[in-house]
Amino acid sequence: MKKSRGFALLAFALAVTTAVPAAANASPQPSAACKDVPNRYDLPFSVCDDELFIFAANYKPFESTVEDEQGAATRVFDEIVGNKLRETFPDVKIKYATWDYPVRYEDLKAAGVTPDIVIEDPKNRIDRDLEPMGWVGDLTPDLKKAGIDLNTLNKSAVELTKSRSDGGIYGVPLFIDEHVLLYNKKIFDKFKVKYPEPGMTYDEAFKKAKQLTADDGLHHYKGYMQHPDQYLDFNQAGLYPFLPTTSEEPAPEDVKVDISSDAWKTYVDNLYRFLEIPRNDFTTVTDFFKGDMSQPGHLAMAVDTLSRLNMYAGSELFIEDGDEAAFAEQAKSVDIGVSAIPVLERGATTTYQPNTRAAFIPPSSPKKEQALQIVKWLVSEEGQTELSSHGVKAVLQTDKVVQSFGKAIPELAEIDTSAVYWGENAAISNYQNTEYWDLPLWSVYRQHILRDGGTPEQALSLSQQQDIPNYIKAQSEAGKDW
């Protein structure tokens, strides 16, 4: 979607910090020292030493802008949790920024500015961005001192974050942009097919997909879309491609990978059959609304994220400014239903690995104690209720938090979202003495199956024997370890 970047970034120069005003009788304070951060947009940006700086990246809704906002890409963070956070900590001057609005990691590093809290994707970004910056370290003793109990949080999200940390844990999971099954009731009703329910197996989904890949006059409907890259990456079977070595940080040439086992073949076969349904060709999961299709509302089922659900439901908070009319028009062709993603076998309750965002506190943060208290609040029942009420899946799942889901998003009121917290996320295991590399698993489906026409067995073997070793070698030669 087109961003209102020019105006929004210009506005960013006018007001980038929000804080509760000091009391009228407060004693005069010395002027804070500020560091300017040059950036590719040549817009003024600075961080002062009396500000606690929160920087977020890789959560798409945070990038949403509006033309009349007093700041760039701050409105979603503020609405979801920022305003409540400032209300809770009136004596803390909180400055928030989203990546590329207008600064990036390398801009901050070059200016000698270290965020006090970084909200990031622990799955792929610890090795890629945070470790090279020197912005992560084991928080175990700090969390214990601050009274942050990870045992109360989503176990799979915690385990995922641990798996990317070289000993201990580098961050605290905050929320999950969960994958759910979206379905269009209009298409189900048209072809008289029963709606999906949580606990539906892939076998049952496959049967429905074939029934719903159908024609009605000049209209062709597709039955099912599930992005194959995400299917592998958020591995529902809990499969981990790396084999243990003798070190937590093995050299590139010592990294061992296995994606050709029977378990991997079975898992890849499971989705492969959906791709073989005649005229259910994979394009994009955003076809659920319109995506690449010529007309909206012609895809019966799609696995996508909660942030996409909020957008489809019509929440202006999650829709880019200027796109509201287009979404409203497309919405006329879709009656949204929400279920959990299909399970691998009858009676199972395991969904994808969590699409987590976590809070990281750089070791060199000058406000580490304050940052820990803010993170503690963010994972408290009060903080998690605030997130959940805005259509974001929380990592603390008390009755109050779960029941609050979507209450602050009026557009979700008529949609049954009870499936959001259904089941348990798949968990990573046996990751000790492995080094995570952002492997090109996309080559399995998108290259060797969809483009080359290969079988799952061929695709897995080629990826393991050629694509992955070539990737690791190229990255290593470029001085990268991800």
PLM regions: where:
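Short helix-initiation/N-cap motifs at beta->coil->alpha
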Residues: 97-105, 200-206, 281-295
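Conserved N-terminal structural module of periplasmic/extracytoplasmic solute-binding proteins
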Residues: 6-16, 20-132, 145-146, 195, ...
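Hinge/lid segment of periplasmic solute-binding proteins
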Residues: 33-42, 122-178, 331-340
